[in-house]
Design a protein with these regions (language model features):
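Proteins that catalyze or organize thiol-disulfide redox chemistry
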Residues: 1-57, 66-70, 74-82, 86-114
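Conserved residues in the N-terminal Rossmann fold of short-chain dehydrogenase/reductase
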Residues: 62
């Protein structure tokens, strides 16, 4: 999937640097998605638009789950899409399934400094 100015594509190789270490400075919302998953095709554009709207308030890290099964297993994902917010190297909250922009905005606002 294409990455915008506030979103990146991440894999098992660069996860530690681009998610865990980077979240020490800026929260990172990880979007675990899969090509075969219709709800993923609904949620990812919502997350990309919000990443642009928040203009650096968080980084969106997109991870294709089928290609990165070790990461999906590490976080015990049970379905897709699943979004996990990392702050200071730790997962602080998550949600699963396609969600409306207002739901995701409220989720983010609970954890981000405004």
């Amino acid at each position: 999937m294409a990455a915008g100015p506030y979103s990146i594509d991440v894999n098992e190789t660069d996860f530690t640097e681009r998610v865990l270490a980077a979240s020490a400075h800026t929260p990172v919302l990880v979007d675990f998605w899969a090509d075969w998953c219709p709800p993923c095709r609904v949620l990812t554009p919502v997350l990309e638009r919000l990443a642009d709207e928040y203009a650096g308030g968080f980084v969106l890290a997109k991870i294709e789950a089928d290609e990165n099964m070790k990461l999906a297993g590490r976080y015990k994902l049970r379905g897709f899409p699943t979004a996990i917010l990392f702050v200071k190297g730790e997962p602080v909250d998550q949600f699963s399934g396609a969600r409306a922009p207002d739901y995701v905005r409220e989720f983010l606002d609970r954890h981000l400094d405004k």
